[in-house]
Design a protein with these regions (language model features):
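Sec-type signal peptide cleavage vicinity
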Residues: 2-398
Length: 398
């Protein structure tokens, strides 16, 4: 009896897909199933074993590398209580055949560069993530060999691997005396904006060639400013790289910004750093702490913090938490003004901190000494006479 091809994940997500192809012995074929997981180390919107809804699979005959089916879409079935994925058209095992299944998500037409999929590898030439952080995508690939004899009951175990590095940036503050308004974020001077990917379906290992890459800045301007006020009933922490994850960046090594003040003798070292578009105000007081020329809560300037490591590895998620309880970083070493035509940060002018300098100095404090009271000896008053005793002797009456 013919059985439709479908995919099922017992513990996580099913992640394969198929298009209809001829079979040599459909009378004895059984259902093809998959039990798949997404690698734990993982954007924009990261893909996990829990949230994956769609996947696309290509299948090849292991014997000659010819295609059995290409780019079949599977969608997670609803209302079943299981992670079962239903294909757009059924597919069947062929007795005696061994297949190479290659799965990707999202669909190849939505990748920055559409991948080329063969039995032995997946390749993408000059793949460059979008420069707007929330437009970036988490890209995953997985491959496995399977036969009906070994997998017609329990399904095929298939693991999908993240091929990018994820950079998640979040902030926190428990200082209820300062209000921070954050309008945007940048990851500045990332070393390589693109690379050529080669993913081996034999060992599920990815390699990146970054020779053609150039420096790039990734950014995101928020629809509404994020306000941190440090109060128990207010907002004390927030994610800046999108609610569903972080920036998705080509894995690479890089030189971090050295965090030093920029001068003619010590110029900016061209390193990578994180920058926030920020407005800072003390709760008590009428002036703004940053930018120096702020005219209200809608005046912003860029502040910076150095990235604390020098490498982002494939499949790793890096979470940077910026604690702003006692400070907000340094003046951006390159472009501190939101609008250079109407500068309000004015680094190094009228006593303002220069590029690369701390925005907050040390906490203002005082070493207090109270002058002791002077206590001249005025004698004692004799209440019987209303006179003052001098040297403990009764005063003479006038």
């Amino acid at each position: 009896m013919k059985k439709a091809f479908y995919m099922m994940a017992a513990a996580a997500i099913a992640l394969s897909s198929c298009s209809s192809e001829e079979t040599t012995d459909v009378a004895k074929s059984s259902t093809i199933t998959f039990r798949t997981t997404v690698g734990l180390n993982s954007r924009g919107a990261e893909l996990t074993s829990d949230n994956l809804q769609e996947m696309w699979v290509s299948a090849f005959y292991q014997s000659n590398g010819q295609s059995y089916f290409d780019d079949q879409k599977f969608t997670k079935e609803t209302g079943t209580g299981t992670s079962t994925f239903i294909p757009e058209s059924p597919q069947y095992w062929q007795e005696g055949r061994t297949y190479k299944f290659v799965a990707i998500s999202p669909e190849k037409t939505t990748w920055p560069v559409a991948p080329t999929i063969t039995k032995d590898q997946v390749t993408c030439a000059d793949l460059a993530p979008a420069t707007t952080i929330t437009d970036q995508k988490d890209l995953i690939i997985g491959a496995v060999d399977a036969t009906s004899a070994n997998h017609n009951t329990n399904g095929v175990d298939l693991t999908l691997n993240h091929i990018l590095s994820q950079i998640k940036i979040q902030v926190k503050s428990d200082n209820e005396h300062i209000v921070y308004r954050i309008k945007g974020i940048r990851i500045v001077n990332v070393a390589k904006n693109k690379g050529t990917l080669t993913y081996s379906t034999t060992d599920n290992k990815a390699n990146w060639d970054l020779n053609a890459g150039q420096k790039v800045t990734y950014s995101y301007t928020f629809p509404q400013p994020i306000v941190l006020d440090g109060k128990t009933d207010g907002v004390k922490e927030a994610v800046l790289t999108g609610a569903d994850g972080g920036a998705m960046i080509i894995p690479q090594g890089f030189t971090p910004w050295d965090g030093q003040k920029v001068t003619d003798q010590a110029p900016y070292n061209e390193g990578t750093y994180i920058s926030l578009l920020l407005n800072v105000k003390a709760v008590k007081g009428t002036g703004y702490m940053y930018p120096a020329g702020a005219q209200g809560e809608n005046s912003y300037g860029w502040v910076a913090v150095a990235v604390p490591n020098n490498k982002w590895e494939i499949g790793n998620k890096y979470i940077y938490t910026l604690d702003m309880s006692t400070g907000c970083g340094k003046v951006d070493p390159v472009d501190p003004e939101e609008n250079p035509d109407t500068p309000i940060v004015k680094p190094g002018v009228d006593g303002n901190p220069g590029k690369g300098e701390n925005i907050f100095g040390d906490v203002i404090k005082f070493n207090v000494t109270v002058t002791p009271w002077a206590t001249p000896n005025v004698g004692e008053i004799d209440m019987s006479t209303g006179t003052i005793k001098v040297n403990n002797s009764p005063a003479k009456k006038k």
